[in-house]
Amino acid sequence: MSAPKLLSLGCIFFPLLLFQQARAQFPRQCATVEALRSGMCCPDLSPVSGPGTDRCGSSSGRGRCEAVTADSRPHSPQYPHDGRDDREVWPLRFFNRTCHCNGNFSGHNCGTCRPGWRGAACDQRVLIVRRNLLDLSKEEKNHFVRALDMAKRTTHPLFVIATRRSEEILGPDGNTPQFENISIYNYFVWTHYYSVKKTFLGVGQESFGEVDFSHEGPAFLTWHRYHLLRLEKDMQEMLQEPSFSLPYWNFATGKNVCDICTDDLMGSRSNFDSTLISPNSVFSQWRVVCDSLEDYDTLGTLCNSTEDGPIRRNPAGNVARPMVQRLPEPQDVAQCLEVGLFDTPPFYSNSTNSFRNTVEGYSDPTGKYDPAVRSLHNLAHLFLNGTGGQTHLSPNDPIFVLLHTFTDAVFDEWLRRYNADISTFPLENAPIGHNRQYNMVPFWPPVTNTEMFVTAPDNLGYTYEIQWPSREFSVPEIIAIAVVGALLLVALIFGTASYLIRARRSMDEANQPLLTDQYQCYAEEYEKLQNPNQSVV
């Protein structure tokens, strides 16, 4: 496959423009015929003597243009179509050279800073706080809702998306790159869709659906962490508000109601259609993207910026599945955090004793795999019963953001408790896209799962204001504790009684005469010694 065709998508994916600021150059520079054909995406930062004179900010020592490093270790055998998907060995099907930034510099041209840093020299630490949406003031809640709506309606100043696969990225004439503008929030939706879409095998062939670069594997938590981080940074730039942070929804309430589904927050239920959002909420006006699955799967097209129908949501309304009519319990989170191994073979949705599979929701909260169970993250999605419960569409419902910030908070607490133990995050043989060093699809510049497997306050510039529930004892544990307690009580009573008996005996003995008929007198011994028939030694 020619370099230009491969490069197309890479440009579109400048979601990664790690923390790109509005004043910096847009990776759209790489969505040109020249860039696509060269396989190089190393834009200038501040060219003085013409194009190509300051690639990656090289003149100021910020970075340099280097070959892309991509993980080529083997993946698990469940994906049998090697060579058929643009996302394989990401991003080499699109770009083979990118900016490698020095120190705390980052971005597509090394013009910005790594997470947790800011300033002209990227030498100032920054820490923002993600808080519970329900704990925000009225003004803060309104600000967050307005910011989301603004992101939905604001064209992304930095990124464009590909609307065709790599083979067709330059258009029918081979000279027209197939990219589109898209809003900031819809870009957030698009990147998620692209990571979960089926593998197109050709017209007339059924697309392969047993592939997912962001779910059902070790990368689930790291991928969604970066996904949120990218949106948060984009919204900070949009608002020109560096301290803006994404709040979270603590969905572990055990209730059968959505406590954030009110018109002043994420929208209540419509009185006219129980599956729609109330017209009193701004989110009732939102329209979804990436819903043309039949075209994607049969024609090989990609999701574009076209918006379709409204968001559907009917919390606790799936009467056919009673198990998804109630949200997770607080104790489910407490139990999940006691699962000490990050992941276990086969590193998939049937892993047992895996923290990742537990918080993702394919195991019960104690870590035991059960094919009938949907818990925590999965249960919260299914509870919403609509757009938010369909993987390829779920980010269209803005509750997705809040649901995943809470999931990320659980992840960060696990990292803190277990010292970010990455030893059980596999280097190879995980599902495709989920190896430890794999570049997460479709972010650009490349960012690996490892880079997100760190505690957020120390490494990513944000922290959570949250109180974790302590684990309650189960009925069997309570019974066991009661039995042990009873045995200890019996032992204590027995020991006390024995002590009292011994003490009484000692007291009786103390009250007896010092010399009785039972004891010999020194006089008797003396008389024996005076007997001449006995020898004295």
Curated annotation (Swiss-Prot):
According to its UniProt entry, the function of this protein is described as: Plays a role in melanin biosynthesis. Catalyzes the oxidation of 5,6-dihydroxyindole-2-carboxylic acid (DHICA) into indole-5,6-quinone-2-carboxylic acid in the presence of bound Cu(2+) ions, but not in the presence of Zn(2+). May regulate or influence the type of melanin synthesized. Also to a lower extent, capable of hydroxylating tyrosine and producing melanin.
- In this chain, Zn(2+) B is annotated as bound at H377, H381, H404
Chain positions carrying an annotated carbohydrate: N96, N104, N181, N304, N350, N385
E.C. number(s) listed in UniProt: 1.14.18.-
How might one describe the regulation of this protein's activity?
A: The activity depends critically on the nature of the bound metal ion. Catalyzes the oxidation of 5,6-dihydroxyindole-2-carboxylic acid (DHICA) in the presence of bound Cu(2+) ions, but lacks activity in the presence of bound Zn(2+) ions.
Which Pfam families does the entry mention?
Tyrosinase
Q: How does it sit in the membrane?
A: Single-pass type I membrane protein
Q: In which tissues is it expressed?
A: Pigment cells.
Q: Where is the signal peptide?
A: 1-24
Q: For side Lumenal, melanosome, which residue ranges?
A: 25-477
Primary subcellular site in the record, as a coarse category: membrane
Query: Which pathway?
Result: Pigment biosynthesis; melanin biosynthesis
Q: What is this protein called?
A: 5,6-dihydroxyindole-2-carboxylic acid oxidase
Q: Which UniProt keywords apply?
A: Albinism, Copper, Disease variant, Disulfide bond, Glycoprotein, Melanin biosynthesis, Membrane, Metal-binding, Monooxygenase, Oxidoreductase, Signal, Transmembrane, Transmembrane helix, Zinc
Q: Give an example GO molecular function.
A: metal ion binding
